[in-house]
Amino acid sequence: MPRVKTGVVRRRRHKKILKLAKGFYSGRRKHYRKAKEQLERSMYYSFRDRKQKKRDFRKLWIIRINAACRLNGMNYSTFINGLSKAGIELDRKILADMAMNDAAAFSAVAASAKAALK
């Protein structure tokens, strides 16, 4: 049986890895082994940070809502409690956007939440 050299297969595999490593720094984009190691690490980071991104945005929305609530004379937890009692089903993303871009509408929502607490 003749000896099979891995020329075409190896070149294809290396090209695939080096193409994915485009934009990496120095030898991490030029050398196959370093590129492969860095690519494995970067895939791990991207998987982990897709989960982290959701938590970070939720934190940011809560901070923005809390700041707007304090301008309306209440804190975040009482505001959320008032919203649930008033039957207002707006998510934190929408509330944070209202707090940043439409303060009058947020004040109206805060007033209705405050009224539901009484």
UniProtKB/Swiss-Prot annotation:
Gene Ontology molecular functions: rRNA binding; structural constituent of ribosome
GO BP annotations, alphabetical order: ribosomal large subunit assembly; translation
GO CC term (a single one): ribosome
Function description: Binds directly to 23S ribosomal RNA and is necessary for the in vitro assembly process of the 50S ribosomal subunit. It is not involved in the protein synthesizing functions of that subunit.
Taxonomy of the source species: Bacteria, Pseudomonadati, Campylobacterota, Epsilonproteobacteria, Campylobacterales
Name recorded for this polypeptide: Large ribosomal subunit protein bL20
Membrane as UniProt keyword: no
Family, similarity comment: Belongs to the bacterial ribosomal protein bL20 family.
